[in-house]
Amino acid sequence: MQDKRTVKVGTVADTAVGGRTKSLGVEVTDSVNSFGARNRVKVGDKSYQIYRLDAVPNTEKLPYSLKVLAENLLRNEDGSNITKDHIEAIANWDPKAGASIEIQYTPARVVMQDFTGVPCIVDLATMREAIADLGGNPEKVNPLAPADLVIDHSVIADLFGTADAFERNVEIEYQRNGERYQFLRWLQGAFSDFKVVPPRRIVHQVNIEYLARVVMERVGVAYPDTCVGTDSHTTMVNGLGVLGWGVGGIEAEAAMLGQPVSMLIPRVVGFKLTGEDPAPGAATDVVLTVTEICAKHGVVGKFVEFYGEGVAEVPLANRATLGNMSPEFGSTAAIFPIDQETIDYLKFTGRNAEQVALVETYAKEQGLWHDPAHEPAFSEYLELDLSQVVPSIAGPKRPQDRIALSQAKSVFREQIPSYVGDGDGQQGYSKLDEVVDETFPASDPGAPSNGHADDLPAVQSAAAHANGRPSNPVTVRSDELGEFVLDHGAVVIAAVTSCTNTSNPEVMLGAALLARQRVEKGLASKPWVKTTMAPGSQVVHDYYDKAGLWPYLEKLGFYLVGYGCTTCIGNSGPLPEEISKAINDNDLSVTAVLSGNRNFEGRINPDVKMNYPASPPLVVAYALAGTMTRLEKQPLGKDKDGNDVYLKDICRSQKTLGHHPIGDNSEWFTKNYADVFKGEQAWRNLPTPTRNTFEWSPDSTYVRKPPYFEGMPAEPEPVADISSARVVALLGDSVTTDHISPAGSIKPGTPAAQYLDDARRGPQGLQLFGCRRGNHEVMIRGTFANIRLRNLLHDDVAGGYTRDFTQDGGPQAFIYDAAQNYAAQNIPLVVLGGKEYGSGSSRDWAAKGTRLLGVRAVIAESFERIHRSNLIGMGVIPLQFPDGKSAKDLGLDGTEVFDITGIEELNKGKTPKTVHVKASKNGSDAAEFDAVVRIDTPGEADYYRNGGILQYVLRNMLKSG
């Protein structure tokens, strides 16, 4: 069949890099231009080609976010996957309609973090070898959309509270991750248009401070900057007016290789902002309030767009924080339009004058500049008066569960009974002398070893003020930390962490000013609190240093532990051994306070049950308090005149931050990003291959060459019907991608663990499936291996088990072992599912592992959209039971032999609407039905005919010469 699509594989320039010539992948195709939208705009002395939105009637009525999508379709119209009808559909968008019209979105660039990015790069490296095996040039495999990978997920706060914590944590980081880092260092030199930012930054902070352009320019064409990323918090860039969100690895790879991302035109929730921020340092409080409002309203799968006169009152850093939290309240994106604040931020962060001028001119020319007086039509409406926002935290297990700080003590007392055992008493002071209550006010100094004051009481206690709540005081003795009493509600982690807040100078300086004021009063953190500081950019370190604030933070124990995600993603590191033992031996329900974005149970630290996102100043305050019961209305201390100082006074004093040390000096950013891709000496010292294909190590348990292209011919073979297939899994409703491909711990005794044991995994241990995503051998064995998965082929058996019908009687077996036996006998596999199959995160290995097990088809009642697309991207056909029917309704129990006919219609250039399924079982009549083929677009049909999206792209690269 003749492929109707224009494939973006042209190269217009070559450059020598490291002694090797590399072709620069550049999009050189042109739009069909059905609306005559192609035009030019002049900015200074330069002229740019643009695609005018006003050439399409009704686009002026659209919300900002949909205007960006409309331009994307207009510029990428190819007459097949993106047609005039698609453009008109978005131009004539009905705000009240549901999300039902599918479009193909072509992001301008891709951003990745190392945890999810490694398997994507493994695929690209494998493609290079495959194209060489087929007689092509390996260097043809290069991103066609610019891609950046930032290493931020690997650093762990193992060491803390000391001046050398950062250096020691970096050393441990390289010991743990040397194998992966060597692979990424090779990538840095081997690919064009793909850059790697070595450790010491967080991807989303780098994105807003450096990578994002707001308006892109490629080959003389100017267009809105858009992106997809392999991390859900990619939405942080929405604060700059850049439309972007998190996707799975398969979609990210497709986008890098010039393929569009399938999506539905969404509903758009207009969020009107009025009033002024209550204080410059209140960004986190605003974010938690917006998160609460959106989660209660219901914004899942929708765009949230901020508008109104209050938008101008929201600083760009605060906008970025709001965008960052989009996944927490469920929206696909949470975007601000472009305005003067955007321009000022671009200047502030050191973007060049030519780029800034292009952004302003383009936005105004295209109707993308925010007009506070104009109210676009939205699907739904929300509103917030910023002046009504109050200091807040959230928790203990969901970021949308906001708690006003004034109510934190009472709410905690309501929550704690559900987190403690039945044996814990309600009268906490029955075990302590009542006088303790007066002995330990909130401003008590702490122990000296972890940034604590020198004058400490005999025994400090987290059980003080425990009256009226469950209490289980436990005395802890430590050579380093002294003697103290732990109890339920003790704050054992206080972490200034995450790009969510560390990208915001006002809240970061607010935390440091609070530290300075408390240290000057002789106050200190409690000895049981693990205090860590992990910013997302070295800019933070530099302005702290310039302002002379580091000594005060360090006096409270907030030493630099690393630049990276750390505590926010669960890399909090272990608690001191004595504290961890006391918690676990006595089943204490302790807490963490962090300036991060997620607080799900078990996420932050295995010893901590209750987690509370808060602003950086509140993190410092809770480190001083040491317990969740101390901050309601008690003073943090007294000023020089002997007056009580309350937390609210600290917050209001931040109005002086208008001229904070960072000022308006863009040199902070130009200096720190001048060598952003160079890395520190440890990075540069990594042994790095110089070949254009990767030198795979046969001993590696982290990075291995996957088998996707083994035996692949230059031309696709005809697709075939499925005969004599067996069911490897019969599943119920709401099976998530985490059920299919877990990211958590590798359970001893399972096929994945056995493989690693046989491979002599080394001192790192089994670790997590998430750490091993670059090794297909581990990930195949982990597919359908979630310990909570219930395969209905068995009664009352959970985990990665099935029945192996290659053996007499179909005995119980691990799914991986049974799949190997089926493969040995050339028996294809199918999976039967219920409603919402593949829901949850867009995890690429849920589709990759399914295909590599030998599954040819998944038949379900309904699919989550991204997973359905990912299955096709891996050559697995998604089929849907007849409307209203389920496997149970059709009498299927998973013991049948399946024949699926009609798939071969795809060889004739058309996609069948249904295929015929016959399920035969000995001793009974066959069940027969017509299943709906969920290949929904011409592009998906092309991918399936080729055996997957990577095979499709590879073959087109070969054809392009």
Curated annotation (Swiss-Prot):
Record keywords, A-Z: 4Fe-4S, Iron, Iron-sulfur, Lyase, Metal-binding, RNA-binding, Tricarboxylic acid cycle
Domain of life: Bacteria
SUPFAM superfamilies linked: Aconitase iron-sulfur domain, LeuD/IlvD-like
Main enzyme class: lyase
GO biological process terms, semicolon-separated: tricarboxylic acid cycle
CDD domains assigned to the protein according to its UniProt record, in alphabetical order: AcnA_IRP_Swivel
Pfam families: Aconitase, Aconitase_C
EC numbers: 4.2.1.3, 4.2.1.99
Cofactor(s) required, per the database record: [4Fe-4S] cluster
Single GO molecular function: mRNA 3'-UTR binding
Gene3D superfamilies the UniProt entry points to: 6.10.190.10, Aconitase, domain 3, Aconitase, domain 4
Plastid recorded as keyword: no
Pathway: Carbohydrate metabolism; tricarboxylic acid cycle; isocitrate from oxaloacetate: step 2/2; Organic acid metabolism; propanoate degradation
Coiled coil: none
Cofactor annotation remark: Binds 1 [4Fe-4S] cluster per subunit.
PROSITE patterns: ACONITASE_1 (PS00450), ACONITASE_2 (PS01244)
Catalyzed reactions per annotation: citrate = D-threo-isocitrate; (2S,3R)-3-hydroxybutane-1,2,3-tricarboxylate = 2-methyl-cis-aconitate + H2O
Task of the protein: Involved in the catabolism of short chain fatty acids (SCFA) via the tricarboxylic acid (TCA)(acetyl degradation route) and probably via the 2-methylcitrate cycle I (propionate degradation route). Catalyzes the reversible isomerization of citrate to isocitrate via cis-aconitate. The apo form of AcnA functions as a RNA-binding regulatory protein. Could catalyze the hydration of 2-methyl-cis-aconitate to yield (2R,3S)-2-methylisocitrate.
Oligomeric form and interacting partners: Monomer.
Family per record: Belongs to the aconitase/IPM isomerase family.
Protein name according to UniProt: Aconitate hydratase A
Organism, as annotated: Mycobacterium avium
Lineage: Bacteria, Bacillati, Actinomycetota, Actinomycetes, Mycobacteriales
